[in-house]
Design a protein with these regions (language model features):
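A short acidic/basic microdomain associated with nuclease active sites
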Residues: 37-53
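Nucleic-acid nuclease catalytic cores
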Residues: 76-120
Length: 120
């Protein structure tokens, strides 16, 4: 997972260098996915994460942006990351039983200041 995390961060930095801040999250997601393909990092997009309630799987609309090798990636393009963004990725990680998550905010001048790593 550490190797995958490094590749994801490297790919995100490449996207940010090319595009800079200020675009839509969907643009950064498309470009990051393209970079992951170029770096041979297998991933899935918008995978449904069910909630198990009283033994029943329910689709409640939880869909992380990207999951690559059990690393959850949530992409933002906001003025500043808020607690709700952290809660969102932590919820995905708990429901999907993933141990590692990256919250990446592309709306910063230096991307390294927009990356938060979460471990459960």
């Amino acid at each position: 997972m550490e190797n995958t995390t490094g590749k994801i961060i490297g790919a995100a930095i490449e996207v940010h260098r090319a595009l800079g801040p200020g675009l839509l999250e969907s643009t950064y997601q498309e470009c990051l996915c393209h970079e992951l393909v170029l770096h041979s990092v297998p991933f899935v997009r918008q995978v449904s994460v069910p909630v198990i309630y009283k033994g029943v799987k329910l689709d409640c609309g939880y869909r992380p942006d990207i999951v690559a090798d059990d690393v959850v990636v949530e992409i933002k393009s906001v003025v500043g990351l808020e607690r709700i963004h952290e809660a969102q990725i932590l919820t995905y990680m708990k429901l999907g039983q993933w141990k590692l998550g990256l919250l990446i905010n592309f709306n910063v001048t230096m991307l390294t200041k927009g990356i938060r790593r979460f471990i459960l």
